[in-house]
């Protein structure tokens, strides 16, 4: 028994066994570089033509949506999802409430963002996309990058969403889930405004 008690402190002071050879730790910055490569890979695969195939739309329309999203600082994936839900990619779409075009802009909202948005410009695909995505970008900034709240405000109006939030109510009406679908986790807690 005395021998065991005396030997215990010596065992506790022994250094840990060396790592097995052949198991090298990743060099510093490895994971950051891997993430950057994965992002680049996703961007290469997310070109307008891949969206055209996925949504079965013309290459011209896919390029217009992709370019307008990039110009206005919106994640192209979110932009395509928004246009699909709003107009099903129909540039002449009109809602019963009076919303128009690919991004279903209300005339007053469109004019508040760009005063030239009147008449035929509301359904001009490039102008409608540009102003619709700028509006979404403004909402993303207003809601500190919260995509769910920005989409709800896009659908219901900023004043309604703000009022619900002030009153402690959840402004959810199902719209954000409809746009985000299975990709909702991708946007949770992360702003999509690209720099």
Language-model regions, residue ranges each:
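Boundary of Sec targeting at the N-terminus
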Residues: 13-14
């Amino acid at each position: 028994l005395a021998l065991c008690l005396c030997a215990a402190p010596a065992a506790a002071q022994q250094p840990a066994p060396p790592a097995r050879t052949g198991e090298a730790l990743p060099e510093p910055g490895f994971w950051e570089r891997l993430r950057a490569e994965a992002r680049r890979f996703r961007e290469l695969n997310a070109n307008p033509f891949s969206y055209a195939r996925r949504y079965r739309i013309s290459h011209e329309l896919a390029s217009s949506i992709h370019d307008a999203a990039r110009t206005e600082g919106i994640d192209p994936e979110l932009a395509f999802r928004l246009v699909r839900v709003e107009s099903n990619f129909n540039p002449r779409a009109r809602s019963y409430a009076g919303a128009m075009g690919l991004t279903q802009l209300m005339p007053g909202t469109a004019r508040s963002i760009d005063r030239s948005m009147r008449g035929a410009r509301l359904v001009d695909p490039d102008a409608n996309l540009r102003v619709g995505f700028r509006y979404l970008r403004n909402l993303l900034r207003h809601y500190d990058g919260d995509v769910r709240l920005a989409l709800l405000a896009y659908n219901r109006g900023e004043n309604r969403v703000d009022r619900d939030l002030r009153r402690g109510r959840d402004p959810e009406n199902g719209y954000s889930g409809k746009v985000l679908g299975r990709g909702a986790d991708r946007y949770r807690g992360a702003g999509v405004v690209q720099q």
